[in-house]
């Protein structure tokens, strides 16, 4: 006697953010935009697709609260982090504090709060097109700049001049981005 074998279709893995991004119908979403807004969204899309840096000015630093699962207490806990806000034209780009600094080189929250008005490079890491905002990473853009700087001999020899951007000024020190 043969026993029937049930064949179940394998469950499809959930789609990644990148896969969901490529499924968006941009023509429908961008239909009512002005030319300036369309240009801004196109530069955001290009940064997300190609991991290329775009430049923007920090216009503010806001605290954002989210609930995260703590495995030790087995409860949801409210966690608040500061996020830099960049608005090139109308689209809000949020940069969490965790995406501002390299691991091991984190700065206190007051340094981020003193960066308002600073011009920074960032890479878009998530696009929330329906909600009208994007999430960026200064950390990834800085990593790309460091790679470029390290592989150009004329930029890091004694006596060479480099471009710098003033990021933050405090009572005893300042933070400068050289590239």
Describe the residue ranges of each PLM region.
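Single-stranded RNA-binding regions, centering on S1/OB-family and related RNA-binding modules
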Residues: 1-179
């Amino acid at each position: 006697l043969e026993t029937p074998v049930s064949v179940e279709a394998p469950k499809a893995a959930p789609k990644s953010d990148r896969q969901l991004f490529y499924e968006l119908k941009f023509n429908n979403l961008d239909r009512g935009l002005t030319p300036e807004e369309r240009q801004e969204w196109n530069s955001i899309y290009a940064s997300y697709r190609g991991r290329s840096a775009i430049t923007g000015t920090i216009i503010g630093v806001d605290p954002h609260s989210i609930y995260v699962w703590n495995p030790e207490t087995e409860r949801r806990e409210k966690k608040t982090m500061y996020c830099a806000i960049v608005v090139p034209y109308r689209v809000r780009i949020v940069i969490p504090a965790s995406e501002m600094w390299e691991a091991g080189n984190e700065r206190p929250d007051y340094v981020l709060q003193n960066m308002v008005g600073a011009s920074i490079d960032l890479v878009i890491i998530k696009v929330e097109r329906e909600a009208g905002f994007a999430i960026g990473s200064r950390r990834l853009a800085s990593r790309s700049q460091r790679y470029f700087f390290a592989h150009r001999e004329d930029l890091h020899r004694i006596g060479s001049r480099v471009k710098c951007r003033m990021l933050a000024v405090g009572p005893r020190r300042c933070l400068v981005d050289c590239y």
